[in-house]
A protein has these predicted regions:
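Short, conserved beta-strand element in jelly-roll/cupin
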Residues: 64-78, 83-86, 91-102, 140-143
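Short glycine/proline-enriched turns and hinge-like loops at secondary-structure junctions
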Residues: 62-63, 130-133
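A short hydrophobic beta-strand segment most commonly corresponding to one strand
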Residues: 69, 132-149
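Short acidic (Asp/Glu) patches
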Residues: 49-63, 94-106, 121-124
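A short glycine-rich, His/Asp/Glu-containing loop-to-beta-strand
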Residues: 34-74, 80-81
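Short, surface-exposed secondary-structure edge patches
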Residues: 69, 108-111
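Surface/interface-facing alpha-helical segments and adjacent flexible terminal/loop regions used
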Residues: 1-35, 40-42, 116
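Conserved metal-binding segment of the jelly-roll/cupin
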Residues: 110-125, 129-130, 141
């Protein structure tokens, strides 16, 4: 998990490449977003606005074809994560949802919140504790070389 303290830092570090530019484009579209409605930019990025507490789960969520970028607008929450290699599969990978559910010990725990940008990489799985409401943009970006079996 990569945590950046602000959007300016994200823009400075990740300024090369179409996928990063599309992340900024998604964030710039914030005034037009309504909670829970998914939007897309091309076929490589989807995004939505979340308002409220992230669902707390006992299992860790992992992806393969997408990685997540969360940009926090308001509030703060606790996220826990661990390398997938240290976790056990509880629910096998589902190609239609790009999710797998894993169990095991928390490797790291961190409070993240307003102004921060968090990138969840594909070799890690994460879960939220649902400890407080947040307002954030959740961006799902295809992994380089990723593909869709059903398209």
């Amino acid at each position: 998990m990569i945590t950046l303290d602000n959007l300016t830092l994200f823009k400075n570090i990740y300024r090369e490449g179409k996928k990063w530019g599309r992340c900024v484009e998604a964030i710039d579209n914030l005034p037009n977003l309504k909670p829970g409605i998914c939007h897309s930019i091309g076929d490589s990025l989807t995004y939505r606005l979340q308002e409220g507490a992230s669902p707390a789960t006992s299992l860790f969520e992992g992806q393969r074809r997408y990685f997540d970028v969360h940009y926090y607008l308001e509030g703060a929450e606790t996220v826990e994560w661990a390398p997938k290699s240290e976790l056990a599969v509880e629910q096998a990978y589902d190609d239609t949802t790009d999710r797998e559910w894993l169990a095991g010990e928390v490797r790291e725990r961190q409070q993240v919140g307003k102004g921060q940008v968090v990138i969840f990489e594909n070799d890690e799985a994460y879960r939220f504790t649902g400890d407080s409401p947040v307002r954030k943009v959740i961006i799902k970006v295809t992994v380089e070389g990723g593909y869709f079996k059903n398209k």
